[in-house]
Amino acid sequence: WKCKKDDHIRFQREEPGFSPLFIHEAASGSKETFGWKSAGYDDSSWARALPYPEGQVSGAVSPGNLLPRTVPFMYRKERFFTALSDLKKSSHSAEDWKDFLSLQKPLLIPANNEEIVEIHAGEEMTGYIHTGFTQGKGSRISLLYAEAYVQDETTGPNRIPVKNDRTDKAAGHLEGYEDCYVLSGLGTRETPEVYEPFWFRTFRFIRLHIQTGSDPLVLLDLHYTETGYPLA
């Protein structure tokens, strides 16, 4: 085994005070790790994994506690987004975005441009997000995950947004936690730049916000791998 600390991923708070998850990311592409899953990647600078002495790792997370599974493995199923929910701001038509989501037809985002689109998974989902790009050096991508469109009014001491019709984009707006990624611009059609948050996300809607810099960006892919425990 070899290992390398990735200094280009930082886990960020979901809330300014108590942060219940601490799994959402502020990440950026890096020449050091670009293509690290490829067979020809040069890992000569990576450190070799070393055995650790007893007591260095807490017993609560020690491999010595491993036992045979009593439940099935979580399943994985490749899924695509079913629809475009709302086109907030874009240089492309709704049909262009639908072709990108359903057919994975590449979408060119011009330089110095902002895109805000909201997409629909069809139902509440749990899955691993996968994105793929070429070009776009310095472009900033954010993915906000939401279960519903919520109202401006809130309820209770914690000021929780009120939910009426969860799909009402006209009278509501999306609120949720997000991942942010800044592109290195190293991606090509043969070897795209890929961003996949480490842990799965739960969502019914996703708001995709793109801000390009001086380099145009090509969106190649946005889908997810559904996961969960089998119900039967």
At which residue positions do the language-model features occur?
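Extracellular/oxidizing-compartment recognition motifs
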Residues: 1-232
